UniProtKB/Swiss-Prot annotation:
GO terms for biological process: positive regulation of transport; protein folding. It is found in: Cytoplasm. This is T-complex protein 1 subunit theta. The keyword Signal does not apply.
Amino acid sequence: MVGMSMQPYGIQSMLKEGYRHLSGLDEAVIKNIEACKELSTITRTSLGPNGMNKMVINHLDKLFVTNDAATIVNELEIQHPAAKLLVLAAKAQQEEIGDGANLTISFAGELLQNAEELIRMGLHPSEIISGYTKAVSKAVEILEQLVETGSETMDVRNKDEVISRMRAAVASKQFGQEEIICSLVTDACIQVCPKNPTNFNVDNVRVSKLLGGGLHNSCIVRGMVLKSDAVGSIKRMEKAKVAVFAGGVDTTATETKGTVLIHSAEQLENYAKTEEAKVEELIKAVAESGAKVIVSGGSIGEMALHFCERYKIMVLKISSKFELRRFCRTAGAVAHLKLSRPSPEDLGYVDSISVEEIGGVTVTIARNEEGGNSISTVVLRGSTDSILDDLERAVDDGVNTYKAMCRDSRIVPGAAATEIELAQRLKEYANAEIGLDKYAITKYAESFEFVPKTLADNAGLNAMEIIAALYTGHGSGNTKLGIDLEEGACKDVSETKVWDLFATKLFALKYASDAACTVLRVDQIIMAKPAGGPRRDAAQAAGAGAEED
């Protein structure tokens, strides 16, 4: 009888043992909203130029000190399924534009927080979703009206125009150093910009991080910087043709074992000589083809190196196949699988290739000053690895912003001017609506206020005063009034030159709204019992006993 009374009931009777089932407003919807709010609370304090850094130590004990939201959420290993939706939205934003991940997460969190208030007032989630959907369409319409006139066309090779659009994205990561970084990134991007700018490839701008010095010691190399020394004694070549061998520079040996029967000392001597002659013949053929530099993707035999020295050929080893591909792009070479005589069209060319020492690190620099090469390297200098990693993220943001502006160069006012204008116009739109949608549209409009509030809070200013001043200015028709964080007052963005890309705002707004509506549409969560077996990594397994909940 006891066994009968303990049998599962309802949906549990249908599922396997260990399943968890959550349903209803309180258990599913509100819990999901709370998880998303927690995530947005983490990233929100990192928004804007005065944003705080987060110190994240991942499961491999790697330390991250950054205010880049995309990096933070990537390394947090979030388990909650609803919060994961926001992470996916941020990743989509990062891949599409390369900037605005924080805006996406924080805005989605704010939308959900306001939705929770409406749910507690008695509105049904479907009514909120309907209102939010209308608000998104209207917001996109308003955003297009706020585009700065004349920004539809730009010369992507004009340094000043590019920097004006890139400054805000880089300043949000490295405030105070944006001028140096923007200048470096712009030069690097313009060098490798193809004839059709929409085909710009972010992989063509590389970053090489070298410890020591400071950011002001950073420079740009038109070509590649390899963190390795040349093999052999030849360390420099000018105007050299390059032969690339992916499989290594060594005598080829068969995979099966060969046995040789030798009767006399002469035969032994001749056997060694034939091997030597074979290697010399191959190296001589490479030298006669005009190549002064050999780049190997594998091992370099001692005998081969000896003959390379004799024929005055510089030898480099690049173990990474990705680096080898980039080197081929830099030099315009075609990689051969094994050591053989290269044809003239397969040879690459570099203006100079030399081994240099920068800050105690030996690097090989391959330069190609003439046009036509497609790789540019930003050499970053800094005192610690964490600083260099963060500088690299700022450079990546700058390069991605350049790619975005090559496709769509339109700009909108930054410094929270766009958000306040959107909030104000959406509130007017909501007042004209009839039905329950108006409450959701009003809350959607209020959600935009988190941007000026967060920017002011992070800069230590009085948020309420700033927002009130912004609303007053925008109400009197000044659509470009934003926050000047340095002076702690409201100022026209035409003076402060803070512009954001239209595409960044548009995609952040769309992705955040989609993520928020997706979370609100969920009314039941059914979770299987986690599969047994080893954890995903040893670090988790070690701490599993302590973490088991």
